[in-house]
Amino acid sequence: MTEKYRPVRDIKPAPAAMQSTKQAGHPVFRSVVAFVSVLVLLVSGLGYLAVGKVDGVASGNLNLGGGRGIQDGNAADGATDILLVGSDSRSDAQGNTLTEEELAMLRAGDEENDNTDTIMVIRVPNDGSSATAVSIPRDTYIHDDDYGNMKINGVYGAYKDARRAELMEQGFTNESELETRAKDAGREGLIDAVSDLTGITVDHYAEVGLLGFVLLTDAVGGVEVCLNNAVDEPLSGANFPAGRQTLGGSDALSYVRQRHDLPRGDLDRIVRQQSYMASLVNQVLSSGTLTNPAKLSALADAVTRSVVIDEGWEIMSFATQLQNLAGGNVTFATIPVTSIDGTGDYGESVVTIDVNQVHAFFQEALGEAEPAPEDGSDDQSADQAPDLSEVEVHVLNASYVEGLANGIAAQLQELGYSIAETGNAAEGLYYESQILAAEEDSAKALAISEALGGLPIVANSSLDDNTVIVVSAGDYAGPTAEANAVTSSTVGQPGADVGEPIESPEFDAGGDGPRCVN
């Protein structure tokens, strides 16, 4: 174990969801929450896209293939995973530098850094019945293969700057083209980092800049929020009294960007963002915004100026899918952390995490993991158990975690299995952990799946009944022996503060007003 990878204490369990907090609005929209409004506005979904109001949304040239796991509009794993990003950018979606007047609206200073201070993974099932939105703190400390240990909000900028330098060396001089191509590299780097951290495959990408946030908020006439206490924090420009109030675009941006002088820092800022988005949906869906031509025009202009989505995303069909979410359930959550006052390699303050625990959290939160059976509940009796000596197991590593296949193989050997081979999977062939067997209901494969935490079994007709291939990708969160290197995926030195166990609320569009927050 190298010095930069230090042991970490047991992670604090992720907070349970508290009782749903009602938001003001017409009852028909009671279960339509922040997620819907953000995607509706950012990717021109319901309403104005459906009637052709927006046709100029920028598309990033991202290697998502129109959604890696999307076929005929449906995700192969049953749900679409979207990476939603708020970029601290001083240029628009077309790469043009913002005007002095527009920069003044942002209250964010003149320094160009392209940090991604809002990172959220959103899962929408194919039937549109529910959705889960998981926030990733901006200071989450990760290991990147190209740039080492760093905060996740700096990944975008690191890859963007490197690509920009390469393009300039190649003779590119057009500023707009430079900016656009460099940003695409930043997006690719962030997509890979989020996939490694969460263990999921990103199907689609949506990004909005600071200007877009201001313009979208102003387009709907402002958003109502509520504060527990008055705040005056000059770094973000947040200067608001306690209680309920309606904020315009610039003030709303300060409201969701403040993290200093808050009890839990970035974690409280995430709560603000989630509460703001819940109020936004009420403003959009209960005030006739989508039937107001003037507001639709303003929304269309805001989207065109500041929103980027991945190339190949069929927005029209996705908008139709979102309409079914009105009667469903949307939940907000935040990834579990090991501390909020950790220390990075250069002494900087960071949020520390354990990748294994984050993978497990996403499997449970996004409905990908089956709960472990209770003692005595296993349906397979002793006389039905397969003869371990007959099983030939191959273990392939399709992740970035060095030694993962060896750790899994050692775990299976301890259980009595014969390991025929360990090695690396062909690059790009597998994105999710799985077990390959002759048949999906193979008793031998089922036994190995149970031993490894419930990995899905995929039938492969080229295999005989005694051969099983275990593929461990970035989402693997099952057991391993100590021979693996999964524990080395924790970086930074955890601090003493794991944050107060404040429950994550579920928001809906009903009730008497916005939830008051710190």
Curated annotation (Swiss-Prot):
Annotated consequence of substituting residue 88 to A: Does not complement the growth defect of the lcpA-silencing strain
Predominant location category: membrane
Gene ablation phenotype (knockout): Essential, it cannot be deleted. Conditional silencing of the gene results in severe growth defects and drastic morphological changes. The lcpA-silencing strain contains significantly less mycolic acids and a reduced amount of arabinogalactan.
One example of a Gene Ontology biological process annotation: cell wall organization
UniProt keyword terms in alphabetical order: Cell inner membrane, Cell membrane, Cell wall biogenesis/degradation, Membrane, Transmembrane, Transmembrane helix
UniProt key word Kinase: no
Gene Ontology cellular-component terms listed: plasma membrane
Segments passing through the bilayer: 32-52
Keyword Isomerase: no
Cytoplasmic side: 1-31
Location within or outside the cell: Cell inner membrane
Effect the entry attributes to changing residue 257 to A: Does not complement the growth defect of the lcpA-silencing strain
Membrane topology, Periplasmic segments: 53-518
Region listing for Disordered, in residue ranges: 485-518
Result after altering residue 138 to A: Does not complement the growth defect of the lcpA-silencing strain
Membrane topology: Single-pass membrane protein
Any Pfam family the entry gives: LytR_C
Family: Belongs to the LytR/CpsA/Psr (LCP) family.
Subunit structure: Forms homodimers and homotetramers.
Domain notes: Both the C-terminal LCP and LytR_C regions are essential for function. The N-terminal region is not strictly required.
Purpose of the protein: Involved in cell wall biosynthesis. May be responsible for the transfer of arabinogalactan onto peptidoglycan. In vitro, has pyrophosphatase activity.
Entry protein name: Cell wall biosynthesis protein LcpA
Organism: Corynebacterium glutamicum (strain ATCC 13032 / DSM 20300 / JCM 1318 / BCRC 11384 / CCUG 27702 / LMG 3730 / NBRC 12168 / NCIMB 10025 / NRRL B-2784 / 534)
Gene behind this protein: lcpA
